[in-house]
Amino acid sequence: KKSLFLIPAAAALSLPAAAVVRTVLTPNKRSDYAAPEAGDYALELARKLSEMVRYETVSHANVDEAEKFLGFHKVLERLFPLVHEKLEKTVIDGNLLFKWKGTGDGMPILLMSHQDVVPAEGKWEHEPFSGDIADGKVWGRGTSDTKASVMAFFQAVEELLKEGYTPKCDVYLASSCTEEWAGDGAPKIVKELQHLSLI
């Protein structure tokens, strides 16, 4: 029975996406990954995050909103085509679980995040679902909690797939859609992982 090695969502926020995942996947080796120059690359990432923020994913307690999140999944599929082409995808009532098959049988890694956001109340300097890119920032509900994490994980895997990289162990990407109200999204993912004998 394998156990999962968990990576908190915030780990990907301070470094370029692929560097984070490559560091985790090859912890005993010096990485030859060179962070790209800021500029076009940074703008590409900002535009992806902006598009994700513009798709409103507010979740409400005890309301079936799976269809809303299926729409958000289409945004992810368009932004990260290789992830959707190469990884095994499982959708559980709007919750996502991807499996990236590794070459060995070492302990799997699970990268966790969530797709949902809390309601946008009060006054905003920029409209909450505008995804405006201004003053060196992406503005809007979900930029830090936590679509930036979702984007970082997907972008990292997308870039590594483009390089032809295959991890030495299985890597899972899990993203629930009811985190903001402690709903049943994460427990459903856990149940699937138990079904796979991973926990």
Stretches with model-predicted labels:
Residues 5, 12-143, 162-167:
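Acidic/His- and Gly-rich active-site-bordering loop/insert found
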